[in-house]
Amino acid sequence: MQQDMQNGGPGNTISNLSSALRQVNLGNSNTTTDQSNISIDFNQQQLLEEANQGSINAYNAQQQQQEHLQQQAQQQQLHMQQLQQAQQQQAQQQAHQQQQQVHQVQHQHVQQDHMPIGQSQQQAMYQGPNPIDSSRITKFFQNQPMEGYTLFSHRSAPNGFKVAIVLSELNMHYNTIFLDFNLGEHRAPEFVAINPNARVPALIDHNMENLSIWESGAIILHVVNKHYKETGNPLLWSDSLADQAQINAWLFFQTSGHAPMIGQALHFRYFHSQKVKSAVDRYTDEVRRVYGVVEMALAERREALIMDLDSENAAAYSAGTTPLSQSRFFDYPVWLVGDKITVADLSFVPWNNVVDRIGINIKVEFPEVYKWTKHMMRRPAVIKALRGE
């Protein structure tokens, strides 16, 4: 109403009529003109009321039309919201159905004793309820070798290659059977009988009445202790109980912390049915923490070695006036336990070889780990084992 008064609505009509009345009313004297003014005033008042009523009616009609349009707009908006909700519910139902279909496939989870490496090999790691073709495994167990070792592994299993590296370093006679997960060979009854976890690696020691061992750490300890007992040479091992304890500590650290964390980081980065960034970040950060532990240990070994072998510059190194990186022994190999390579070191190799696939550059982030790994990767036995020979 206030807007109408400003734009020439009913209020403006009243103002114009009042001006006209003032012009007709000549004064306060009682003349005949005053009587005519009364008539004019009465007529003008009637016109004023009629004009005002017409404006009010027009205004009310306009208001009703606006309210009707607003109601139509609100109804249309409500209809659109209901349509969008229906579409969202339909999309959610479709996504839920797809997720159920995914979960109906029984994937074979990659655990600490089995982690795929190549993208083409990743699909082979997940097995649905396919029939088991155990013919090859059955044939092997019906005619086992009389001596040596049989290693059950997979082409994409770092822990299987970890055992192969130790067997190769000890120059032990062994044969590797790479299981075909697409055929379900890891679920063959004969294999489950020697490894109830139905995972790789598993080892049969044919020289000990076909003794079967499973879990990579247990296999390595069996092999290295047997070699030491038979030869008297603590190769990859130690004749010191104190050093043996330290070797065991690092070996258990690798099997319980290093390998599983990389395995989970790979799983959530590449294999999980949904992208869960928090899981990827959590396991990748944990891998970095683990490498930080190894990096610190190797750095301490490096400093001790330089101080021992580069004695003429030891004072400058201790004072900090000369950085350790200037020592000629800065790239000299150092090991986790003692002054020689052991199974504690070699157990890390296959997993260090795949860690770049979770976005960790050990050369940049962990230089001592990188140098340590590089020395081990150049060993002939390691090269042979990683080739699957």
Swiss-Prot record:
Homodimer. GO terms for biological process: nitrate assimilation; regulation of nitrogen utilization. Belongs to the GST superfamily. This is Protein URE2. The gene is URE2. Keywords: Nitrate assimilation. Plays an important role in the cellular response to the nitrogen source. URE2 gene plays a major part in the repression of GLN1 and GDH2 genes by glutamine, and is required for the inactivation of glutamine synthetase. URE2 gene product may catalytically inactivate GLN3 in response to an increase in the intracellular concentration of glutamine. SUPFAM superfamilies: GST C-terminal domain-like, Thioredoxin-like. InterPro entries: Glutathione-S-Trfase_C-like, Glutathione-S-Trfase_C_sf, Glutathione_S-Trfase, Glutathione_S-Trfase_N, GST_C, Thioredoxin-like_sf, Ure2. The keyword Magnesium does not apply. Residues 240-389 form the GST C-terminal domain. Residues 147-231 form the GST N-terminal domain. Disulfide bonds: none annotated. It comes from the Eukaryota. GO terms for molecular function: transcription corepressor activity.
